[in-house]
Amino acid sequence: MIEIKTICQRIYNKIYIPRYKKQMGACGERVFFSPMNSEFIYENMYVGNDVHIAYHADMVASKSKIVIGDHVVFGPHVSIRGGDHCTDVVGKLVDKVGDDMKLPENDKDVIFEGGNWIGMNSTILKGVTIGRGCIVAAGAVVNKSTPPTIVL
């Protein structure tokens, strides 16, 4: 007997996932993700083919792009940050500074060249390119770009 939870998940996947994919800047084939318990800024995500993003992903880029090549797998609780808070506006607290006040250096694209495996609880920060074939270990914080085929 199929559980009610499984039936609800299948219905959700058939109805809502295609809608979320259409909101992306680009979305390839065989892309799997869990929007119910994740945070994405869809219009700034450019996703290739054969990509799997596990639950509780946090991929945020308000003025930059997150570009994910083909054959990339993200473990659970991965955080991708395409920018920083703007902290140099005099006379305003950080929570009162909107995206319209950001400087170009506050946000930079994050790029995954393809064939990557990003471990659970890892964080990738603005301006980073993860080279083709790289593996990022669980819990890693990556703030600099990597050459191809290394393990972090």
Give short role names for the model-derived ranges.
Residues I2-E3, Y12-N13, G91, V110, ...:
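Short, highly charged low-complexity linear segments
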Residues I2-T6, F74, E113-N116, V136:
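Hydrophobic transmembrane signal anchors and adjacent membrane-proximal interface regions, especially
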Residues K21, K96, I150-V151:
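A generic alpha-helix propensity feature with a strong bias for hydrophobic helices
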Residues M24, F40, L103, N143-K144:
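Generic structural signal for beta-strand residues in well-ordered domains
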Residues E29, N49, D70, G114, ...:
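Short acidic capping loops at alpha-helix termini that bridge into adjacent secondary structure
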Residues I124-L152:
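C-terminal/domain-terminus segments
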